[in-house]
Amino acid sequence: QLHKSLRNYPELYENFYTRMIRAGEKDHLSNPNKIDSFTIPKLQHFLNDSSMKVIFKSIAATFNEFDDYKEKISVGMGNYSDIFNAGITHAQIGTFYSNFNATVLENDHVIWIGLDMYLGNDNDIVKMLPPNTFPNYYKQKMDKKYIISDVFFSFLMTHHFNPMGDELLARMLSCLLYTSPSPRDRYG
């Protein structure tokens, strides 16, 4: 079932399978002989792992309702579209488990949010993450209050990367999320 769902999002699937859960190679996803013998069994093993079940349960409890986040992202995208005449009428948002590898990705024309990265600093799973990989200052940012700003920072880095620094991106993010009335009135 997971294999069938992920096939609809080939970029995310490749990232998830090969890099995030490190289950196998890219050709395992497209080679019919390897799908049945490698891919599906590895995905089943992953889904049935007791640790994964605990993490999935924690994600479900923390994010039992996600519509408010989608609404705020939609408003921000509308502001972005107004400022840049981008013609964005709808941002497709998806959520996934990143194996603690990614906060926000843009793959397959979808903005993907790794919910495991926002369980909260006080979450027992987050507390158990190794401090050499996840120092305390990083765990402090693993909070759902950062989802919206992380989505827009990632989106702006993808579409308006500035190698000279992120001051422009910070100004744009602030404008998209907090400007009222219209940003055009402010910047002409």
Where are these regions (language model features)?
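Acidic/histidine-rich, surface-exposed loop or edge segments in extracytoplasmic proteins
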Residues: 49-64
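Zn2+-dependent metallopeptidase catalytic core
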Residues: 68-87
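Acidic helix-start/capping segments at beta-turn-to-alpha-helix junctions
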Residues: 93-104
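Loop-centered beta-sheet repeat module
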Residues: 107-162
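Single conserved hydrophobic/aromatic residue that forms the stacking wall/gate
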Residues: 178-188
